[in-house]
């Protein structure tokens, strides 16, 4: 079993949780550089957009009514795992979802707050965006 590098517990409002998750991930990311002529292009090994989308999905689709079912983020040397005890909508497999994405949040008020707060788009394309970034 792989060992993760660090852990933290975040107890804050929804938007502060989002920021804390993103900051936690960035804290452990490495910069990779590409030098082309005189231009140096440095970027995180995992793009910021991927971290944002995965963090939003983690919070939006969390099972909020059970403290025993807490989502988590584990950072390993070769990957980041965003784990949520929630499930895909009834009758939808991950493969089906990739073919026909749609938004079906467990808690519409949480999804609405993130949408109205300008951090989520509400179309159900977050996972697809992760694969294309």
List where the protein language model places each region.
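Helix-hairpin-helix/helix-loop-helix acidic hairpins
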Residues: 9-40
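Conserved beta-strand-loop-beta-strand hairpin that lines the nucleotide-binding pocket
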Residues: 1-19, 46-133
């Amino acid at each position: 079993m792989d060992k993760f590098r660090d852990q933290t517990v975040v107890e804050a409002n929804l938007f502060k949780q989002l920021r804390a998750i993103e900051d936690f991930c960035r804290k452990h990311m490495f910069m990779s550089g590409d030098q082309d002529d005189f231009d140096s292009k440095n970027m995180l090994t995992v793009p910021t957009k991927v971290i944002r989308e995965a963090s939003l999905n983690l919070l939006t689709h969390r099972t909020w009514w059970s403290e025993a079912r807490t989502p988590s983020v584990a950072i390993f040397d070769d990957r980041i795992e965003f784990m949520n005890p929630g499930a895909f909508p009834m009758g939808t497999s991950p493969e089906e979802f990739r073919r026909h994405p749609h938004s079906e949040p467990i808690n519409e008020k949480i999804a609405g707050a993130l949408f109205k707060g300008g951090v989520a788009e509400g179309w159900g394309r977050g996972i697809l965006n992760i694969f294309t970034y």
